[in-house]
Amino acid sequence: MKMKAFLMFVLLFLCSMGTKAQDLGANYNENIDYPITEIEMLKQSKVSWVRGFVNIPNLFLQNENGKIVGVKENAIRTHIPTLKFIQAKKALGDRVKFILSLKIPFELYTDTVPKVGTKEMEYIFQATEILLKTYDMAKNIEILVMGNEPEWENALDTDLCHADGEDYRAFLNEFANRLTTWKQTNGWTFDIYAGALNRVSELPKSETVPAVVSVVNNNPNVVGLDLHVHALKINQAEDDFRIIRDKYGVTKKLICTEFSMVRALNPHVADALGEWGTKHGYTAGMKIYEYLNLIAEKANAGTPVSATEFKSLFESYSWYPKNWYKTFYEVFKKYDTYAITGRFSVVPGGARAVYDANTEMWELGGIYFSRYLGLDADGFYNPNPLLYPDFIAARDGLAVSSLVGGQRELFIRWGNGADKTGILSVTDENGTEVVRRSLDSENDYTLVENLVPGTAYHVALLKSDDAV
């Protein structure tokens, strides 16, 4: 008999607070043409969101001598990755919502952030409006994010203290207002977010952070803020979200479209395998990047190493932040993060085709490995054993969100993982079933009464047909 069960004593007062599981998604960064190639994997993973970004200046603006001088209209209207992004949305249907972030690195230009009303700014808006109309992009996205890590992309110096904060604030306000006008004119329904701020707890002197936050807090056309967490320490996610909520007073929705601990991993890419290496058939002096190259070759040859071996290597190091995905997810829940999109897979090839001592280990932050552990029976990438168990637990949620036990009653609040078509079964310590009832699909809680103090009860959620 299939069941989700737990054991408790009702004479104890139990109180376990929980929140609804947050919606997880897949982030593809600039590779917006790639989700269409992973449709079946996306369906199998049951993600709720897909996110990508478009670099407006690099792709769609004309640049001469550090000035924006025009719009590449034909490049926008014939941009194949845009078409494939929309094709992926249509293939996945209404259950999966899409997020588009607009990356606008003003550092490319000598005047950095243009003034409101200038030709340079109008070209940015013109390119964006054409993009949103191309292939009906605007009708197929749920969220549009203005900006992508502007702390780095607006900076005039290395300490990030002088980054045209006031001009950027004016730009975002004007951008949000223009987007709202286009929405009203065209019947578009996407929500407007500002962002994406990154590593805010590390940037107390940044002009950009308070500029973006002020737009979120004060512009009624902006629904919320996008936060990126690329952390050096595992507690940084908590620090970043707390600062945004408490210091900056943001009460609107939060989303997180990128998160990783790659900065904690990168310094160790050339670490030796050491004792673990000799125990597993490698040399102690082999470096991590050499191991990664070797197992990629093995996987390509159809003889991948096991997930157990791979996981055991990284968990043998004291510096590896075990269960960091779970830790981050708990922070996302605590701060009621609306949408969360982490790295899903990594596009094979490119700059990371062969690792060396300077390669950044982004791939270790993906839910699936595109080249390390081979393919499963269905031809899909095998999952990353360092993260996948925590991803599944976070995605599915808990059957029980919270419990409160009294002397004669038990209050159960059902979590996101509960099957509301199931049967609640309560048996006493003698195996006698004292409660059997269907769950109320309209309510997230159940009250069980008339229990006997000092008695242990077994509480189970069964499938409605008691099928195995």
What are these regions (language model features)?
Residues 196-226, 236, 240-241, 265-274, ...:
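Substrate-binding cleft/loops of secretory-pathway carbohydrate-active enzymes
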Residues 39, 45-66, 74-199:
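Substrate-binding cleft and catalytic face of glycoside hydrolase catalytic domains
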Residues 396-418, 453, 467-468:
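Pro/Thr/Ser/Gly-rich low-complexity, intrinsically disordered linker/stalk tracts
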Residues 458-459:
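Hydrophobic beta-strand segments within extracellular beta-sandwich modules
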Residues 50-52, 100-102, 139-142, 148, ...:
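Aromatic- and acid-rich polysaccharide-binding/catalytic face
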Residues 448-452:
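Short, flexible loop/turn segments at beta-strand junctions in immunoglobulin-like
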Residues 259-265, 270-397:
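Substrate-binding cleft of secreted/luminal carbohydrate-active enzymes
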Residues 146, 171-210, 253-263, 337-345:
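Aromatic-lined carbohydrate-recognition surfaces of secreted/lumenal glycan-active proteins
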